[in-house]
Every structure is written in C-alpha cells, then in structure tokens.
C-alpha cells in the first residue's frame, strides 16, 4: 500500500485523481490548488458557477473551508450528526475560499465520507479533496476504475482501483441550517 500512497501523494500535488465514493467514482484534486481545480473543471466540461463538493475523513479537514462560527450552537448537533455518511451538507463558507469551489455562493458543499477507501485517501493525504462525479457533464458517472480510464484516458493522473460503496444514487445534498434539499437520495 505504501507505493499506492506514494503515487497518490505525487499525483495530488498538481494533478487530478479518481477514487471510489459511496455510489460512483469521483474525480478530485487538492482544493488549495486553483490550477488543478481549473483543470478539473475543464476536463469535466463543468461550469465554474456550479461549484464543487469537498470530501474529508473528518470535520477538522473541512474547517479551512467552512465558517464554523456561523453555525449556531442549536444547529451544531443537526449538522454533525449526518457524518460520517452519504450526506453532503451546504454550509457557510469561510472568507477567502476560492469561488471555483463555491460557484460564487456564500456556502460550500462538504461531506465527511463514510466510504473507507475515500476516507483513507483523505486521511493519508492529510486534507480534504474536491469531489465531483467521474463523468463528462451530461454523461453517466463511472462506477469502476476501468470506466474512469475509458472516459478520461491519460487525463487522470492517478486512479484508486477500489470498489464504490454500492449505493444506487449519489449522495443526498441538504442545507441543515434551513432544511433545503438540493438533491434527494431517492
């Protein structure tokens, strides 16, 4: 596994990686690297206005992006009780976070994943990852490493060859502060 992690560390510095999530393969990069984020958006043919999701091994990896102090104490349990798990939350964004991640909004989409391969990857890298489905906009997302290779070829710098979590649908997306549902899991 050490060789695998070494390859992941090398690829994430400037590149795009693919890894399994709860339902589909995700494409990701270091959210602190704007060049890599722009490359990812270009590869996916995804408009920057849509924003991106960040996944993490634990909530502390999301603190550089989430304005934690803006989450009221009476909402804190509601927010944190969703994780780890297959729920992406829309939370207040910390000042200075790239608009490429937020789509220009004052919120950011984040998830503490329970899917162990993705969680182990975030743990090993020591930070959150951008996470967007591994597909060209408008096409079906890849569900295997082979499908990622088929859709993207050499455009992806490293692929984690593990299984998805087997969920039928992508994660639910909600704003727990106002109970707005952006994507249901049904």
Where are these regions (language model features)?
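Active-site-adjacent structural elements in enzyme catalytic cores
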Residues: 1-186
């Amino acid at each position: 596994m050490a060789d695998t992690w070494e390859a992941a560390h090398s690829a994430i510095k400037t590149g795009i990686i693919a890894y399994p999530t709860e339902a589909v393969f995700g494409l990701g990069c270091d959210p602190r690297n704007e060049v890599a984020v722009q490359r990812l958006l270009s590869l996916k043919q995804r408009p920057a206005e849509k924003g991106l999701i960040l996944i993490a091994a634990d909530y502390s990896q999301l603190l550089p992006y989430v304005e934690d102090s803006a989450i009221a104490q009476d909402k804190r349990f509601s927010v944190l009780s969703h994780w780890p798990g297959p729920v992406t939350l829309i939370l207040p964004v910390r000042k200075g976070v790239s608009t490429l991640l937020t789509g220009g909004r004052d919120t950011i989409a984040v998830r503490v994943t329970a899917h162990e391969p993705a969680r182990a990857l975030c743990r090993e890298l020591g930070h959150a990852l951008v996470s967007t489905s591994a597909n060209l906009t408008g096409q079906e997302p890849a569900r295997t490493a082979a499908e990622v290779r088929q859709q993207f070829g050499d455009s992806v710098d490293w692929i984690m060859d593990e299984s998805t979590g087997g969920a039928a649908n992508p994660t639910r997306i909600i704003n727990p502060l106002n109970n707005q549902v952006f994507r249901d899991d049904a």
